[in-house]
Amino acid sequence: MKAQRVRLAVAAGTVILAASVVASGQPPSFAGDWVLTSISPQRQGYDQFWFGTEARVTQTDTTLVITRVSPPPLREARFTLGAESQNEYVVNGQKLVRDSRATLSRDTLLISTDTTPADGQRWLSNILRWSLDPDGTLIVGDTEICGKGECPSVVTTLKFKRK
């Protein structure tokens, strides 16, 4: 009887330990209403396509949606985590197709995007790297790929706070 209690206690302890390991391994939640607090380096005319200065992010285990709230134009991007997603926009009267791959790994979300303008020439145009600081600040590293490699890429770091 005593041996059975010991086995049950050990089994219960193992379940509790396993549950705490799984809980601590949960991916971060980027969901919320976000407001831009800083941008580095400052670049005249720079405007993050999906975020702008204010955005709403909704997230499930398998999807992520970014809704640009401000400044206009309102834009929405929908991603399926671990798969390719396509979003279409009209920019300056021209159709723009953005094919993205969103991957959540450890505490980082990576979104790599190919852009296809009206001329049909698709290229890797952008890589976003998201993470959360311990204080809850959303850090977005935005790497813009210049054309088809004929000039240097530009990396901009954006910081957002929850509204």
Labelled PLM ranges:
Residues M1-A12:
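Bacterial N-terminal signal peptides that target proteins for export
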Residues K2, S24-G25:
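Intrinsically disordered, low-complexity regions enriched for glutamine and histidine
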Residues A18-S20:
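N-terminal signal peptide c-region/cleavage motif recognized by signal peptidases
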Residues G25-K163:
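Hydrophobic small-molecule pocket/channel-lining residues, especially in calycin-type beta-barrels
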